[in-house]
């Protein structure tokens, strides 16, 4: 029975000590989302190619535009849509858990679109979100999704784009 829930990739790309950086923000917000876009925190040779960095950035800005507000240049400032490393308050997650269903198709939300869904649904529920830079290491082992390959990466980018536009 925890008050804070953390999610992360299971491929060694995240460092648990970044939780010490993330958790204090929960005194001012509901969810802290990581970004892998700050170069000084990324290990050389990781899977974030130029395509991944810029694709994530532009998709993040599309979400910002979708939920734009004139206050503080928007509701959220994002640079990375695909980072699953995040922490959320238990009571905030409870506002979302009954809705892990695509409201258009009725299908459960999972897979690569899950981080997008968490972010977008949180915005719609008026949860306060902040993004913080995290350490990003080289992946241990092979990618199960093959998203580090150019064609697969483009396919994932198009899946993300479609999800953002239709959700």
Language model features with spans:
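Catalytic donor-sugar/metal-binding loop of nucleotide-sugar-dependent glycosyltransferases
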Residues: 116-137
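Short beta-strand-to-loop acidic/aromatic patch adjacent to the donor-nucleotide binding site
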Residues: 2-13
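Residue-level signature of catalytic and energy-coupling elements of molecular machines
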Residues: 11, 32, 89, 122, ...
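A short amphipathic helical element positioned immediately N-terminal to and/or at the very start
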Residues: 153-167
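Conserved residues at the C-terminal ends of beta-strands
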Residues: 8, 35, 135
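Acceptor/aglycone-binding surface of glycosyltransferases and processive sugar-polymer synthases
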Residues: 4, 16-100, 105, 140-151, ...
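Acidic donor-binding loop at a coil-to-helix junction in glycosyltransferase catalytic cores
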Residues: 108-117
